[in-house]
């Protein structure tokens, strides 16, 4: 029996520690594949031909604002409709009119992120479990651990 297809999530984050944290969170959702880009241009290149089920975008990227990047990503085939989340330390950012459906404030809260990942990606809810060994991130930041 073939393994079920994993659902792809694109995360754009320029701070390696935040990227590692998100990768560790995603270790609790093996049905999801997290792809991490560190800036807008890399995100555009990664997104070509992908069909992510969810977009997670930091706002303060080195080459653009996350809202501008979202507008550019929406022009790519297959990226017109996936939910987009602003992931930011700027809790005052207003998402109205930006194309984001939610704002996740940093620092992230594990239970909230896992519950929202389940809902937004269509996964059945999973119980919160304690990790028995350190998470191994699947990204270009893996060498930092």
Where are these regions (language model features)?
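Conserved acidic carboxylate
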Residues: 13
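Two-component/phosphorelay signaling modules centered on CheY-like receiver
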Residues: 16-35
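Acidic catalytic/metal-coordinating carboxylates
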Residues: 39, 65-71
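Active-site residues of response regulator receiver
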Residues: 58
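Hydrophobic/aromatic residues positioned on beta-strands within the core alpha/beta folds
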Residues: 85-88
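C-terminal output helix
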Residues: 108-121, 129
């Amino acid at each position: 029996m073939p393994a079920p297809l994993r659902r792809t999530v694109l995360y754009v984050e320029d701070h390696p520690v935040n990227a590692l944290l998100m990768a560790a969170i995603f270790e609790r959702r093996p049905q999801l594949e997290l792809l991490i880009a560190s800036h807008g241009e890399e995100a555009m290149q990664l997104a070509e031909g992908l069909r992510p089920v969810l977009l997670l975008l930091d706002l303060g990227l080195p080459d653009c604002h996350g809202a501008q990047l979202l507008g550019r990503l929406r022009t790519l085939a297959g990226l017109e409709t996936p939910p987009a989340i602003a992931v930011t330390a700027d809790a005052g950012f207003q998402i109205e009119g930006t194309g984001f459906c939610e704002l996740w404030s940093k620092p992230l809260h594990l239970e909230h992120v896992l519950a929202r990942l389940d809902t937004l990606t269509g996964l059945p809810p999973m119980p919160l479990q304690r990790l028995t060994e350190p998470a191994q991130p699947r990204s270009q930041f893996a060498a930092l651990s």
